[in-house]
């Protein structure tokens, strides 16, 4: 019987079919993102191109850098006689049509989708007001015995230095989560898992970050009195964060919240701009890693799930989100992940463990 990493005709055929499905899926998702923007926004094409000229080169450089690191690492292991399982085929995969086809299509789809999302979030979501904050406040209080969840997190994590740690985990340390898509592009094994991750990543931006966010438009607690409400509901949280920012800051959250509000008030479109609370894309990206982690090994699954839970708690603690923003995000992501996984063979049948040419 062929070993798990042996390149057999059946595995080569399965990988080729998955690659074709993946390319069709990501091109379709990017097309939907662009269509939504063109149909619902008056911004036109210029801001999309401007944002894309920032995202595109950065994404490409990071991908090529990680690709170079991977190629050098495999070559070094071969030179040292420490051949890794399945790595002998990697240089051949590096020069294959499937590999480069996936890479180029994926980078283009990512650039188009994220650029469309950015402009959509800045020009469509909230353009007719943030309508559902009051509803989500009520949902949160129904789940937490009449209290706002931030009251509980700040009662337990009362130190400003606890808030500082959460702020670090929520913002600067979140970069690897955002780069998960590019890591999957240059990785070697488990194509079914990688295709599921990347498809879910892009679909999450469109289905959750664009369609659902516009249908359920809300600004989040920190913007009480500015973008919704009369400023009384969350003023204690806003004052507390301002005080802690003075004593233990500066917090990235406070800077980012002020920055996004300034962009919103001036009608500017910038990378990372736009205000939207429900559902939380921050939590979507965190739980994408958690879902993937469980398919790699139990320890990683537990570790990344704990981190994702911290992100969820942190989103409430820092005033970005209502608790239910995360709940809806995780439930929607689970459906997207499972649908993509079924399509690529992650569930229901044995997946191809190693990529082939």
Predicted regions and their residues:
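Interfacial segments of alpha-helical transmembrane regions
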Residues: 105-107, 182-217, 222-234
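Interfacial helix-loop-helix junctions of multi-pass membrane proteins
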Residues: 217-226, 277, 309-335
């Amino acid at each position: 019987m062929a070993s798990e990493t042996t390149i057999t005709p059946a595995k080569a055929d399965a990988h080729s079919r998955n690659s074709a499905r993946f390319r069709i899926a990501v091109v379709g998702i990017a097309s939907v993102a662009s269509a939504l923007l063109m149909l619902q926004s008056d911004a036109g094409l210029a801001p999309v191109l401007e944002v894309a000229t920032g995202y595109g080169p950065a994404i490409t450089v990071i991908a090529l850098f990680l690709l170079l690191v991977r190629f050098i690492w495999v070559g070094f292991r071969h030179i040292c006689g420490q051949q890794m399982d399945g790595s002998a085929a990697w240089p051949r995969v590096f020069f294959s049509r499937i590999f480069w086809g996936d890479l180029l299509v994926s980078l283009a789809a990512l650039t188009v989708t994220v650029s469309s999302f950015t402009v959509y979030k800045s020009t469509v979501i909230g353009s007719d007001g943030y309508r559902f904050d009051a509803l989500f406040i009520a949902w949160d209080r129904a789940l937490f015995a009449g209290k706002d969840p931030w009251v509980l997190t700040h009662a337990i994590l009362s130190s400003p230095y606890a808030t500082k740690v959460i702020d670090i985990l929520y913002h600067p340390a979140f970069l690897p989560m955002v780069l998960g898509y590019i890591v999957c592009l240059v990785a070697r094994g488990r194509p079914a898992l990688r295709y599921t991750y990347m498809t879910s990543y892009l679909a999450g931006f469109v289905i959750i970050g664009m369609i659902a966010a516009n249908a359920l438009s809300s600004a989040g607690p920190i913007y009480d009195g500015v973008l919704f409400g009369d400023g009384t509901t969350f003023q204690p949280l806003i004052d507390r964060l301002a005080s802690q920012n003075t004593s233990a800051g500066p917090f990235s959250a406070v800077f980012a919240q002020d920055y996004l509000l300034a962009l919103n008030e001036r009608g500017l479109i910038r990378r990372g701009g736009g205000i939207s609370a429900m559902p939380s894309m921050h939590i979507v990206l965190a739980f994408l890693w958690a879902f993937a982690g469980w398919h790699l090994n139990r320890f990683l699954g537990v570790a990344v799930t704990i981190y994702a839970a911290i992100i969820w708690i942190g989103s409430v603690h820092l005033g970005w989100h209502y608790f239910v923003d995360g709940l809806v995000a995780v439930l929607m992501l689970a459906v997207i992940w499972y649908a993509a996984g079924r399509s690529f063979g992650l569930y229901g049948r044995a997946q191809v463990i190693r990529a082939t040419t």
